Amino acid sequence: MPSSVPWCLLLLAGLCCLVPSSLAEDLQGCAVQETHATAHDEEHLQEPAEHKIAPNLADFAFSLYRHVAHQSNTTNIFFSPVSIATAFALLSLGAKGDTHTQILEGLSFNLTELAEAQIHDGFQHLLNALNHSDNQLQLTTGNGLFIDESAKLLDKFLEDVKKLYHSEAFSINFRDTEEAKKQINDYVEKGTQGKIVDLVKDLDKDTVLALVNYIFFKGTWEKPFEPEYTTEQDFHVDEKTTVRVPMMHRLSSFDVQYSDTLSSWVLLLDYAGNATAFFILPDQGKLQHLEDTLTKGILARFLGNRHSSFVNVHLPKLSISGTYDLTSILPELGITKVFSRQADLSGITEEVPLTVSKALHKAVLTIDEKGTEAAGTTMWEIMPISLPPDLKFNRPFVLIIYDRNTKSPLFVGKVVDPTQK
């Protein structure tokens, strides 16, 4: 066996990562050490654990988005910051030294402001809250640890990942790469109810551990679009390229506002449940300005200042995906050692030096007309006398799905070309 054995970290993620678990009993035993805490301190201590990490997740989401966007302005972007952060927070349980510090700081955590135990508490409560938020969103997720039958992982690492991230562990023979691929792909296909097949295309026979994270998500709009009003329309990819796309249409009362700061129109559409979609349409020539300016504070202001107006909304139906090699993206955020031969993952196993040789993230998004059915009620909408304005998402726009309950960005994307798969 070579002196440095690669650890293949495989990630498949959609809109969010949901792992049923709770640290409520553990946190009930925590005592407040300061007897003269300020009102702000007391409020922070009473704050839900998942809310404590939400600002960091938002910072990570926008930082990662900008790095991905700067790599190419001609392709769609779609990824789940919550899923990526969860996977690497899990990985940090087995990291030590600079490797450990780089991972958490790369995820936008400041260890002088938030203790590591609070970070893991936050993730556990976040995943638990997402998984139990409601029954109106179809969510399927899982974390699978596939361990080579020749490897001996440390008991503490296995206990921590099972307790905190509810990971399943499987023994596998990576030397038989075809059978190993089949076992992993069967696990993902079963977990996603057949929606995701052949996730793993190739494996290194020297792999000793593969972490597979998958997600399947399907949400419905609170106010659906009517399919009979969907028509083929132009979408302007750039000044020289126009494609024909099925464009949904609805004349209704929408949460929409114009942002001078972003030079963009912002449309908020609620899913049935706790999720809200932000569709952000920049003025002509202002896409990069939007990408450079958007922050978690601006999003919070939109949510806190919602108001409705009658608008003709035109939104493309689409099905897009994003696949990313995180070994080339995360180093730009300062996470470098875990992908090198200097990686210290001795908290996973002390038998051989490990490095992450592969870290894949895949996310899939489908937007269509479907929404929840009204149950035995009829709603009349009073139309304005003046002609309502048109809001046409017929050029590149930014998309964010946000969970209102946990205050977390479930996914971030950019639609450059709705016909691009």
Swiss-Prot record:
Q: Which processes are annotated in GO (biological process)? A: acute-phase response
* PROSITE patterns, A to Z: SERPIN (PS00284)
Read off the Gene3D superfamilies from this record. Alpha-1-antitrypsin, domain 1, Antithrombin, subunit I, domain 2, Serpins superfamily
Q: Which InterPro entries match?
A: Serpin_CS, Serpin_dom, Serpin_fam, Serpin_sf, Serpin_sf_1, Serpin_sf_2
What does the record say about PTM? N-glycosylated with carbohydrates having biantennary side chains.
Q: In which tissues is it expressed?
A: Plasma.
Residues modified by glycosylation: N73, N110, N274
Source organism, top-level taxon: Eukaryota
GO terms, molecular function: serine-type endopeptidase inhibitor activity
Q: What is its main location?
A: secreted
Q: Where in the cell is it found?
A: Secreted
- Report the protein name in the record: Alpha-1-antiproteinase 2
